[in-house]
Amino acid sequence: MLFRSSVKPGDEIIVTNQEHEANTGVFRRLAADGIIVREWGVERDTGALNPSELDHLLSGRTKFLAVSHCSNIVAHINPIAQITTKARNVGALTIVDGVAFAPHGLPDVDALGADIYLFSLYKTFGPHQGVMAVRKPLTEKLGNEGHYFNAAQIHKRLVPAGPDHAQVAAARGVAEYFDALDTHHGGTHAQSRPERVRELLHGAEQPLLHRLLDYLKARKDVRLLGPSVARERAPTVSFVPHKITPAEVHLALGKRGIMSGAGHFYAVRLLDAMGVDPARGVVRLSFVHYTSPQEMTQLIEALDAILG
């Protein structure tokens, strides 16, 4: 593992229980090497991380902090710029999992201050390829994972198996898609394009998210997980039905032509912390900027029929 050589027994790292297991489990294993693993826990009722609690965990011994930009279950958008500043003040690195946020916010990695930011291109309308943005000075400290004679080539140092050329070439389509989206809506200046695209995504998603949250909040037979206010979250909405199982809701939606998910979504620690049985799981509904108002109406009408 890349970070194994940069920490020693007695050093500390911070993880959260809000994460997809991919951004916490691998770091927790360092405890076997004498690394002290501190957990930043969520609030039981909301699933949110309280930034003030982080102050009690950070110290001069903290080497790095792993945190999600937003959870794939509660979808609360964490104040990453504030979190990375706190970590940097004690000399700690930050590893941010942006998978659940990237499709909805076009993150400005520099402004966020993350040392490493990860997301999946297939979540951002591209090929099935992972992306890891690493601050250049950090690549020197991480060492070479590739062939020894490629050590001086930054784009090869962290790719031990070599690049998947077809996927890398296809990644360009993501940028082209956002360019086309901006142009379609009257954008002309490339320099300000990222911010305009963020506003376009936000403007399309928020009204629909507001409708769904209001609907679920009004029901007494479900538990909505995460913020009930649209502006505080990404449009990934999870809930626990009280009368039937998440799997039953998922199957019934599928029969009505509506895609959903049911399960723990690899966030077992989070569900445990919130008092939700991971084996039963949650219903998860996700949508993006091209979801239509008509589709949201179809979803709400279907939930009415299924939940009773």
Residue ranges and their predicted role:
Residues M1-G308:
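Pyridoxal 5′-phosphate
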